[in-house]
UniProtKB/Swiss-Prot annotation:
Domain of life according to the entry: Eukaryota
Entry GO CC: cytoplasm; nucleolus
Keywords: Coiled coil, Cytoplasm, Nucleus, RNA-binding, rRNA-binding
KW Glycosyltransferase (keyword) present: no
Cellular location(s): Nucleus, Nucleolus; Nucleus; Cytoplasm
Oligomeric and partner information: Interacts with KIAA1191.
Region (Disordered): 117-213
Function: Multifunctional RNA binding protein that plays a role in RNA metabolism and DNA maintenance. Participates in the resolution of DNA stress and the maintenance of genome integrity by localizing to sites of DNA insults. Also plays a role in proper nucleolar organization by limiting nucleolar size and regulating nucleolar number. Mechanistically, regulates the nucleolar levels of fibrillarin and nucleolin, two key players in pre-rRNA processing and ribosome assembly.
Origin species: Bos taurus (Bovine)
InterPro entries noted in UniProt: Nucleolar_protein_12
Biased composition (Basic residues): 169-181, 197-213
Designated name of the protein: Nucleolar protein 12
Stretches of the chain forming a coiled coil according to its record: 32-95
Length: 213
């Protein structure tokens, strides 16, 4: 007796799924590993360059602000020196005496002594006489303050140096690989001309034996 096959209704049938692959995209995916790797390296190098430019821009702005600050301090010091020059001025007083035969003019010159009132912070004459040479030596030894040449932020310079080092490392990888390949090619030993196969040696030994007999 044969098996009774149950007839399925049209609603119960499952729809077939047909998968179609794009051969070009499939081939590109399977063979494009090196291409994608090179693209990732290029993107990383571009990102490092962009970050390096930003850090250098920050460093330039910081140095510019330091220069402006130093300029303002120097201008303020010059203004203070001008004010002191105006204060240290000489006052002259003239008195004329008329006589029948000649005229006498008495002029009194008095300087404004700021050291007496301790306005300038200068030492007294007794102290100045004893410590004259020492003050000259100390004034000669004092270094002049120069404009800042380097950034005061060490972290910023460290970031720039690390970014440049990574950029050079990425660019030198290809050169190192090429050099290694060239070195391997040069170190390969050429096959020796005197090397013979086993069959060749057997033939030679056989000929030697026959010639000896």
């Amino acid at each position: 007796m044969g098996r009774n096959k149950k007839k399925r209704d049209g609603d119960d049938r499952r729809q077939r799924l047909i998968l179609s692959f794009d051969e070009e995209k499939r081939r590109e995916y399977l063979t494009g590993f090196h291409k994608r790797k090179v693209e990732r390296k290029k993107a990383a190098i571009e990102e490092i360059k962009q970050r390096l430019k930003e850090e250098q821009k920050k460093l330039r702005e910081e140095r510019h602000q330091e220069y402006l600050k130093m300029l303002a301090e120097r201008e303020e010091a010059l203004e203070e020196a001008d004010e002191l020059d105006r204060l240290v001025t000489a006052k002259t007083e003239s008195v004329q005496y008329d006589h029948p035969n000649h005229t006498v003019t008495v002029t009194t010159i008095s300087d404004l002594d700021l050291s007496g009132a301790r306005l300038l912070g200068l030492p007294t004459p007794e102290q100045g006489a004893g410590s004259g040479p020492e003050e000259e030596v100390s004034s000669m030894e004092k270094p002049t303050r120069a404009l800042p040449r380097k950034s005061r932020d060490p972290l910023l310079s460290q970031r720039i140096s690390s970014l440049t080092a990574s950029l050079h490392a990425h660019s030198r990888k290809k050169v190192k690989k090429k050099r290694l390949r060239r070195a391997q090619d040069t170190t390969k030993k050429p096959p020796s001309a005197t090397r013979t196969s086993k069959t060749r040696r057997r033939r030679l030994t056989g000929k030697a034996r026959h010639s000896g007999e």
